[in-house]
A protein has these predicted regions:
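Short, glycine-/polar-rich solvent-exposed loops and beta-turns at beta-strand/coil boundaries
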Residues: 17, 40-42
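Extracytoplasmic/periplasmic/luminal assembly and interaction segments
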Residues: 1
Length: 233
């Protein structure tokens, strides 16, 4: 949440796991620069701002942190500051340059959206890698939600059946086309270095505490889902 003091001073806080559309809206509001200026840059696929591997999408490429947007003269200057910081951070974290960067951030963004505890990120990224390796669909609500511009809790069965959504990982094979948020350091490191394990499933069994259980078999996963249903009852 943006603190009142920072907002008043024109400082923008970009949070880990925040979607690019929210960052653009907050940046326009706090800087006083027209939203249309940001929209034009987005429409032009971040030309001269984004690296080639971003594929013309800002999602994932806006480094979390605090930015004095009030002091910046244009939407281009604001977005370039965020992207340049992101590139520097990826270098610092040792993320290989080139197309691997986009892959790492896609996986990191999914992990951050799926669970609310950094302790679980490495297990979620392992589940993703294991499922990809076995040719399984990812079946992640967070990606479906992103493609529908809703929160994961708002995903419906109908949405998971929609084959026209390129982010519907119940229907598409492999990874979605872009990251689904701007992941933070912990999630990126988890994507780079997944925990060792043979898990293929996970389920958050307590939505208050965020307790999440991981499973290697469908039967084991079904037991975890039953535990969630019991908690929800």
């Amino acid at each position: 949440v943006l603190s009142d003091t920072n907002q008043a001073a024109g400082f923008l806080e970009v949070r880990p796991g925040e979607r690019a559309t929210d960052v653009f809206a907050n940046a326009a509001k706090l800087s006083g620069i027209a939203q249309s200026e940001f929209d034009t840059i987005i429409k032009n696929k971040g030309k001269d701002i984004l690296p080639n591997e971003a594929g013309g999408s800002f999602e994932g490429w806006l480094e979390p942190g605090t930015y004095n947007v009030k002091s910046m003269k244009s939407a281009s200057e604001i977005l370039k500051a965020m992207v340049d910081k992101r590139i520097a951070k990826l270098d610092e974290l040792g993320v290989p340059a080139g197309s691997d960067r986009e892959r790492v951030m896609i996986i990191a963004s999914i992990a951050e959206a799926e669970v609310n505890k950094a302790d679980y990120y490495g297990k979620v990224t392992r589940v993703i890698e294991n499922r990809l390796e076995q040719g399984m669909s990812l079946g992640m609500d967070s990606t479906v939600a992103y493609g529908n511009n809703v929160k994961p809790a708002q995903v419906t069965t109908e949405m998971t059946q929609d084959e026209s959504n390129p982010y519907n990982t119940y229907k598409i094979s492999g990874l979605p086309p872009t990251p689904i948020s701007n992941p933070g350091d912990s999630a990126i490191q988890a994507a780079l270095h997944p925990e060792g394990g043979n898990w293929l499933y996970f389920c958050t069994v307590n939505l208050d505490t965020g307790e999440t259980k991981f499973a290697a078999t469908a039967d084991e996963h079904d037991q975890n889902v039953a535990e969630l249903r019991k908690w929800q009852a």
